[in-house]
Amino acid sequence: MTGHPLDAIPPELPVYPLHDQVIFPHMSFPLFIGKEHMGLVEEALRNNRLLVVLTVLAIDPITGREQFARVGTICRINQVLRFPEGGCKIILEGVNRVRLITTLQVTPFAMASVSLIPERENRNSVAQALMQSIIALLRVAQSLGQMLPEDAHHAIDRIDESGKLADSLAVYLNMEVKDQQRLLETLDPLERLKDVYLFLTTEIQKMQARGGGSADRSRQAVRSQKEHLLREQLKHIQNQLGEEDPHQADIRQFRSIVQSDEMPEVVRSVAEKELARLERINPSSPEYTVARSYVEYLCNMPWQRGTSDILDIDRAQQTLDDDHYDLVEVKERILEFLAVHSLKSSLKGPILCFVGPPGVGKTSLGRSIARSLGRKFIRISLGGMKDEAEIRGHRRTYIGAMPGRIIQEICRAGANNPVFMLDEVDKIGQDFRGDPAAALLEVLDPEQNYSFTDHYLDVPFDLSHVMFITTANVMDTVPPPLRDRMEVLRLPGYSDEEKLQIAFKYLIPKQVSENGLDKHPLQFEEQAVLKIIKNYTREAGVRSIDRQIASVCRKVAKAVAQGKDAPEVIRSDQVEKMLGPRKYFSDVAAEEDRVGVVTGLAWTESGGDIIFVEVSTMAGRKDLTLTGSLGNVMQESAKTALSYVRAHHADFGIDAQVFENLDIHLHVPSGAIPKDGPSAGVTIATALISQLTRRPARRNVAMTGELTLTGRILPIGGVKEKVLAARRAGVTTVLLPERNRENLKELDDHILAEMTVLLVDNLSEVVAHTLIPDTEHGPRLFDCPQHLAVDPPSGS
């Protein structure tokens, strides 16, 4: 309990002699008063309930008079409990240190004149460090044995003044009277703290000697506290020399940021609380690093700091055109955003998803968009990510906790409105640590991401100003709720003509510059580039073309570096010398019309491609064998196709008895590549009919479409990619579902002029366009027992 300060004291006060005890200011102390001292108590009650308590140092053996200490404590009587037989119990409260001036009387009780000793308070860094060290030593002592009562620990933890802490511990600790009196007479609080610290250290060493097993651990704790004390003293000396304490410099810098107008109010309140906590933590403590990192993130986050958008639509159009060829739909969407943003400043960032095969420019397009808007660009790859904490962060209770990648990158960018690209969103994993795709639902939802709460920050951050762009090769593996939050923009593959334009406009100048050929003029003939495209690459994008052009440039650079004659123009006949034998052939479609082999079209992560469906029959018991690493959906498509052919055998001139004595083997090369999807249904059915009727399939016809049990052909995706793949493979006629008519608008006019694209609605139309009538090749019967052979149909 803290006593009330005294402005003045009476000239004479009764003195209570205390043997073998010392009373300190701010402490409550019970005393039992005998009858012989009741007059002293009555006198004190008349003098504002005040009396002086002096410790008796000795008694004169001749006179019997008590010799008082020169420094004592003026106390206030808070409570008097009188006993029936005489005497009483009083509760004294220490108020202030006093110095004995003179003793005025001795009998019947001592009266003296005293003077108040002003209480000094020392709040410098050394005193604060000593207080923290003493508290830590008390915890060490408590682990070795109960040095203080439990309630005393709680009381001491609440003391924030160095002098009071030293006085309180002097009462609770088992100190000798002479040591307590010396502390009472020590007026400098810092010196009193040092004495208490030394006493605690000595006591702990004694307890360690008795404690045994835990001695090493406790000794290390004491040593750490000593080191901490020395460091704090060093800081105090540095301050006196004008050298600033780095810890205090950080605190001041953080506080200036917290008190600025940039932080939202809810974040400021959390930051101020953490900053106050940081000030109380010992900088050498591991907890200090954790707290400082958290405060640093709070101060460095761009809560209301962003870049100014460049709202010049013509300039943005020029920037996008300079970086990327074609991609009209994507560019138009960005310009629409700019136009709306120029009319309405408080516009939420769009959530776009670029879907297309590798190498078509999805990632580089995001960087170009950021440049056209004048925004910071951030990119993280989600491929293989399996830990939800990568998105939401770790809670600070974990060792090594950090924010999620979203908050980390925004903090690093220093702007709250960057263009943020989440690459490979279709390749996110999932395991026991959570589902990152589910964590992205809040990030990519404009109705929720204005208050995105990272587990580490634990305060909301507004993501609504961020323009999120995700990329994917296919959308099949993206969860439907996540897909629903994104505006999907498809980037189809490029035709050979488009690749040629991209090579001359972007790839060749880039590789010439990167390979140090700026001073050596190097040009490519158009036929040379076309030869590279057709003979050395087979992809929907332009990544392989870029690598082949880079290989040519490196060989020229090598010749220049060696002082040899280096070509200035790359001609068509030089390509094979530099890149070796051709790797791909344009006429990869079947070289001849074959029975049971039909060309289909597939859509993969790498763009469009052609596939061959091969069917073979043999005597057996109606077994259907499927090989070629076919997925469940494709296997079901094969069974559906066979069921349709059996149900409508008469329409195709097939005897029903054929199916009772045959095994059918269906294979789709290459066997090591997994294949799946429903769009091969019409191709499988056509191959079955070709084999069972012995009618060859035209080698220059390719098809795609999902077949139903009723013979209808359902629409499919990736029309442009599949048509381009057919064109690369030398196919001249492509059969597409009638319901994909609108998708033909994606194809350039010159492609439609070069190829024949037929729209079909049922399997009969497909058979008519694909299988060669028997009149062209003569009768063909499949190899089976003669009694099973059927007459070839007259036509289809």
From Swiss-Prot:
Binding residues annotated for ATP, in chain numbering: G356, P357, P358, G359, V360, G361, K362, T363
Domain Lon proteolytic: 592-773
Subcellular location: Cytoplasm
Recorded GO MF terms: ATP binding; ATP hydrolysis activity; ATP-dependent peptidase activity; sequence-specific DNA binding; serine-type endopeptidase activity
Residues covered by the Lon N-terminal domain: 13-204
CDD domains xref list: RecA-like_Lon
EC number: 3.4.21.53
Induction, per UniProt: By heat shock.
Keyword tags: ATP-binding, Cytoplasm, Hydrolase, Nucleotide-binding, Protease, Serine protease, Stress response
Keyword Nucleotide-binding set for record: yes
InterPro entries (alphabetical): AAA+_ATPase, ATPase_AAA_core, Lon_bac, Lon_bac/euk-typ, Lon_lid, Lon_proteolytic, Lon_Prtase, Lon_prtase_N
Keyword Transit peptide on entry: no
Active-site residues (renumbered): S679, K722
GO biological process, one term: cellular response to heat
Domain of life of the native organism: Bacteria
Predominant subcellular localization, coarse grouping: cytoplasm
Record-stated family: Belongs to the peptidase S16 family.
Protein name: Lon protease 2
